[in-house]
């Protein structure tokens, strides 16, 4: 089933209703919870978090660093979901995200892989249905496509 940009945006935004950012305990827990899920289910990717390579979910839960990082990642997901219908703004945000992450020398395949991780987190908390997951993966495909173009144009490693 093919979806329009508006349908994708609406479904992604809806899936985030229970995962709001904010300074409340729940808002902070929403973001930190993503990293607890991430560190538990994708331990091989902890290498990208200097100083936290050996962290467990329990370490993440108690970490102010991941409280803050969780807010940043959730905010980023809210932003890309909410601007998806504005293709130029969406692409500009993708490029800016790449620029901010250059210093980490990430495997370029991880840009698409993120959406598998993120939808897995949403599923694990009961915040995602099949249609919303398909929408996130469609958004992720577009996100990744712009990532790879920008990486190539920046003379950085990219997925061919």
Curated annotation (Swiss-Prot):
Tagged with keyword Iron: yes
GO MF terms held by the record: heme binding; iron ion binding; oxygen binding; oxygen carrier activity
Key words, A-Z: Cytoplasm, Heme, Iron, Metal-binding, Oxygen transport, Transport
GO cellular component: cytoplasm
Residues that, per the record, bind heme: 101
Main location: cytoplasm
Positions of the Globin domain: 2-152
Record bears the keyword Iron: yes
Localization in the cell: Cytoplasm
Cross-referenced InterPro entries: Globin (IPR000971), Globin-like_sf (IPR009050), Globin/Proto (IPR012292), Globin_nematode (IPR012085), Mb-like_M (IPR044399)
Pfam families from the UniProt entry: Globin
Function: May be a globin and may play a role in oxygen transport.
Similarity-based family: Belongs to the globin family.
Name used for this protein in its record: Globin-like protein
Organism the protein comes from: Caenorhabditis briggsae
Gene assigned in the entry: glb-1
């Amino acid at each position: 089933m093919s979806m329009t940009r508006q349908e994708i945006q609406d479904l992604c935004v809806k899936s985030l209703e229970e995962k709001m950012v904010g300074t409340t305990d729940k808002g902070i827990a929403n973001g930190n919870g993503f990293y607890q899920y991430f560190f538990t289910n994708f331990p091989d990717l902890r290498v990208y978090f200097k100083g936290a390579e050996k962290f467990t979910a329990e370490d993440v839960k108690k970490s102010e660093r991941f409280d803050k990082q969780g807010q940043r990642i959730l905010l980023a997901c809210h932003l890309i979901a909410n601007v998806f219908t504005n293709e130029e703004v969406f692409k500009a945000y993708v490029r800016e995200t790449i620029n901010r992450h250059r210093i980490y020398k990430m495997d370029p395949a991880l840009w698409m892989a993120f959406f598998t991780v993120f939808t897995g987190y949403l599923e694990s908390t009961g915040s995602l249905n099949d249609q919303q997951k398909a929408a996130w993966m469609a958004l992720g495909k577009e996100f990744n496509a712009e990532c790879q173009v920008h990486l190539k144009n920046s003379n950085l490693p990219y997925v061919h």
